[in-house]
């Protein structure tokens, strides 16, 4: 079957006319993980109350939302590895957001790249969905906003940003932190703060840049880490280099969760200091503890080609 589109599929009128990628709450599925329950069962907004965690009157665990990017899913191995690393590190409630139906990559896998603009058009709606779940956590389960952190890759980074904007509109306050893993560049590079992930979307917004084409070189957060100058990651071959570099952001962050050594961010300048001379007042470790370091701004991060990727044994003096 041949599907042909005439006009701009990013236009809301065109999307409505063709129903390319219709959004509803049922197009977003969730996996809830804790140390006690690691089953990758899918839940919807209507069925989430069946999970043991939501049979409680109060949820005391810190909450981490993980949102995948275009053409991916919550069960993709890199996100499963991230969730496992988080559960090993702390007693979290992890909410893995699966929005592949809203990106049309589930129904039309062979044509998935045709639907990028349609997926972009649904990012704010998926963000609003996450905000709705956050509202439920705060109001029904007494989870403080300071206990909620969002992690998103590529389009998932912008989805997380839109969720951060929406909870503020709902007068819930700000999320503790949003971590954008190589936020998608196409359709977002020139957008102002209201139309992309932005430093005002949470109390602390951490951005990892790993691909200059699929991602963006633009500063977006409280801290922006330009890993290997933000492009051409070591160990990524030329032919699939951009996709590999784009995905490396997820792998880097997972290693930062999993291991004691950190990826060290050195303040960007014409003559950046070597990581061997980094101090806690000048440099920042990428990862869950980044906001404990006082420095803000843009940082250069040297990495190795293989895991655990850290340079200088990941030590700050």
From Swiss-Prot:
It catalyses: a 1,2-diacyl-sn-glycero-3-phosphocholine + H2O = a 2-acyl-sn-glycero-3-phosphocholine + a fatty acid + H(+). Its EC number is 3.1.1.32. Coiled coil: none annotated. It is found in: Secreted. CDD domains: Pancreat_lipase_like. Expressed by the venom gland. The keyword Zinc does not apply. Residues 1-7 form the signal peptide. Keywords: Allergen, Disulfide bond, Glycoprotein, Hydrolase, Lipid degradation, Lipid metabolism, Secreted, Signal. Catalyzes the hydrolysis of phosphatidylcholine with phospholipase A1 activity. May act as an allergen and induce hemolytic activity. Belongs to the AB hydrolase superfamily. Lipase family. This is Phospholipase A1 1. It comes from Dolichovespula maculata (Bald-faced hornet).
